[in-house]
């Protein structure tokens, strides 16, 4: 049994996330966590809300609430919606936790002690109208790289180029909209990433199995232009982790907080400690996941994130870990994603464009969305959500293929043999051919899941469903029963067991449908079907079941048109 540590990029607190956020981190991480648990491995799956920085302050101000109150409320909302999508976190924490405060300050102290922190006097934008320095995200303007007119002072969300506020064309305050800005001098702490470049580069070069997307972004940031740069890790904000050197004051840094991208990844570790606190565990229980000197040496650590988060996870966070000179666990594999676009444009939280997680759950259950998003995950290139494609995929894959098989088998059995698994005779050549095909396809599915090739895994899973449908169609028990009832019983016995097999292997993608199917079958044996032939004997003759309701209903043209119109505008 392996030990798998899984983290998803933690979502910003500034509002409910859209489907593009979901498919770029949390949902594929959940798929992998569920699969690994299903195979019997020990899994620790951690996520949290990212509560510090400019987005939190701006969103709270817009909502007319103190930032602490706003963050507490939004954490509960995001937690509830995540549960609605059946995201199976072992813990969903908060980057504003006391654990993360202490751990962030600890790392900063270690970095300073080891010579990897430098105090820098710099010129920063000051808003006369707002009477304050404006951190990166408090400044908006036109991107000098692509011309996008709502670029932020730290990064353009359109082209992903990292920026400094002074790079922006026609900059303005995100608080007041004022263009009355000045550049004044202030002091900040910088993480000396350049001093760690050789270590970081050697580490990245050792990751020969990483996706091309991850590696290419990391190496681009290492080598393009002037190469890896030192990074400011403090900000002039009111809300965040106060700057301390361990548990001691940091002279000259009074009133400042750590940059959100410094403390946010540390929450992966702190969140695991929060899990221990919440579940009556000891320090050793969480340290065995993170400290290589305390049991984490055999842990495989996998991160999931959108491509815009890759630079921070391949460079800045590893620099923090390495520079601490303490035995913390570094990531083994980073699964990164391109963007999911929406009907010809981009999903956007800040602009309210697209379908958001709460809206999605208000019109259809989670499994419909999980299946479409995962089977269209933007792995090798950007992908696009359209309502036509969504309708077609749900209707064909879920309703016509999987749902139809479950319905036909259970209803036919009920009408001819009652709601118990029939006995029948031995399996014939047709059944043995199916078993061989299923065994081969199951191996392909497992291989894709192990490799985190999500779209390919969905394709292989669908092929497994199709194989069962093709068998049922060619075996035609509804015809055979007229002349050879015992043979028809054997076919249905196999088919009922096949439904259980499908529930088990489909659970990572569609957990609710899997659970309801197993409940209808009166079965709680979720053991993985390593041996397909044995798995197809799991429900013995005489085992009682109940005919389930429709597993997946079809989306009508009228519904599709109505939703397309409803979500064509901007969420306010």
Swiss-Prot record:
Predominantly, its location class is cytoplasm
Which cofactors are reported in the record for this sequence? Zn(2+)
Question: Which ranges belong to the motif 'KMSKS' region?
Answer: 346-350
| Superkingdom of source | Bacteria
Q: What EC number is given for this enzyme?
A: 6.1.1.10
- Key word Transport present: no
Q: In which residues does the motif 'HIGH' region occur?
A: 11-21
Q: Which UniProt keywords apply?
A: Aminoacyl-tRNA synthetase, ATP-binding, Cytoplasm, Ligase, Metal-binding, Nucleotide-binding, Protein biosynthesis, Zinc
Where is the protein localized? Cytoplasm
List the catalysed reactions. Answer: tRNA(Met) + L-methionine + ATP = L-methionyl-tRNA(Met) + AMP + diphosphate
- Cystine connections: none
Give the GO biological process terms.
Answer: methionyl-tRNA aminoacylation
Annotated residues that bind ATP are located at 349
Q: What GO cellular component term, any one, is given?
A: cytosol
Q: What role does it play?
A: Is required not only for elongation of protein synthesis but also for the initiation of all mRNA translation through initiator tRNA(fMet) aminoacylation.
What PANTHER family would the database entry show? METHIONINE--TRNA LIGASE (PTHR45765), METHIONINE--TRNA LIGASE, CYTOPLASMIC (PTHR45765:SF1)
> What is annotated about its quaternary structure and interactions?
Monomer.
The record's comment on protein family reads: Belongs to the class-I aminoacyl-tRNA synthetase family. MetG type 1 subfamily.
Q: What is this protein called?
A: Methionine--tRNA ligase
Protein species of origin: Cereibacter sphaeroides (strain ATCC 17025 / ATH 2.4.3) (Rhodobacter sphaeroides)
């Amino acid at each position: 049994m392996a030990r798998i540590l899984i983290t998803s990029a933690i979502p910003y607190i500034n509002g409910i996330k859209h489907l593009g956020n979901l498919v770029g981190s949390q949902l594929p991480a959940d798929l992998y966590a569920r699969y690994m648990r299903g195979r019997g491995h020990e899994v620790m799956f951690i996520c949290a809300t990212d509560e510090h920085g400019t987005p939190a302050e701006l969103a709270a101000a817009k909502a007319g609430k103190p930032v602490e109150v706003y963050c507490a409320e939004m954490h509960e909302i995001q937690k509830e919606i995540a549960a609605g999508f059946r995201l199976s976190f072992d813990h969903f924490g908060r980057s504003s936790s006391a654990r993360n405060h202490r751990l962030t300050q600890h790392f900063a102290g270690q970095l300073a002690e080891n010579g990897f922190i430098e105090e820098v006097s710099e010129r920063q934008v000051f808003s006369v109208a707002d009477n304050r320095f404006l951190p990166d995200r408090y400044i908006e303007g036109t991107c000098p790289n692509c011309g996008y007119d709502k670029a932020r002072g730290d990064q353009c969300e359109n082209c992903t180029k990292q920026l400094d506020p002074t790079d922006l064309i026609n900059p303005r305050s995100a608080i007041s909209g004022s263009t009355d800005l000045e550049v004044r001098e202030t002091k900040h702490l910088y993480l000396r990433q350049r001093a760690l470049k050789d270590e970081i580069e050697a580490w990245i070069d050792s990751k020969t199995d990483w996706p091309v997307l991850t590696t290419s972004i990391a190496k681009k940031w290492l080598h393009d232009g002037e190469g890896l740069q030192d990074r400011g890790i403090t900000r002039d904000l009111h809300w965040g982790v106060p700057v301390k050197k361990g548990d001691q004051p940091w002279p000259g840094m009074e009133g400042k907080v750590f940059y959100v991208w410094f403390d946010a990844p540390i929450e992966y570790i702190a969140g695991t400690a929060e899990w221990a606190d919440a579940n009556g565990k000891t320090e050793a229980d969480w340290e065995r996941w993170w400290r290589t000197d305390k049991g984490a040496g055999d842990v495989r650590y996998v991160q999931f994130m959108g491509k815009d988060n890759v630079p921070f996870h391949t460079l800045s966070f590893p620099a923090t870990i390495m520079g601490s000179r303490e035995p913390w666990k570094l990531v083994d594999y980073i699964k990164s994603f391109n963007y999911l676009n929406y009907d010809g444009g981009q999903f956007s939280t800040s602009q309210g464009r697209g379908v958001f997680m709460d809206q999605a759950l208000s019109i259809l259950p989670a499994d419909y969305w999980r299946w479409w998003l995962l089977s269209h995950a933007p792995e090798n290139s950007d992908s696009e959500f359209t309502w036509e494609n969504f309708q077609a995929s749900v209707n064909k894959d879920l309703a016509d293929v999987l749902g139809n098989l479950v319905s036909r088998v259970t209803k036919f059995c009920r009408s001819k043999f009652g709601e118990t698994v029939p006995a029948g005779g031995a399996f014939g050549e047709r059944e043995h051919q199916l078993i061989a095909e299923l065994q081969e396809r199951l191996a392909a599915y497992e291989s894709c899941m192990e490799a985190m090739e999500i779209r390919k895994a969905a394709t292989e899973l669908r092929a497994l469903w199709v194989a069962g449908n093709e068998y049922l169609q060619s075996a035609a028990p509804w015809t055979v029963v007229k002349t050879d009832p015992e043979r028809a019983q054997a076919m249905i016995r196999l088919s009922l067991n096949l439904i259980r097999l499908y529930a088990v292997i489909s659970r990572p993608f569609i957990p609710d449908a899997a659970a309801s199917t197993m409940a209808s079958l009166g079965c709680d044996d979720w053991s993985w079907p390593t041996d397909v032939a044995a798995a197809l004997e799991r429900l013995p003759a005489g085992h009682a079941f109940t005919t389930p309701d429709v597993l997946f209903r079809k989306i009508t043209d009228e519904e599709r048109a109505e939703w397309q119109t409803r979500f064509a505008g901007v969420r306010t």
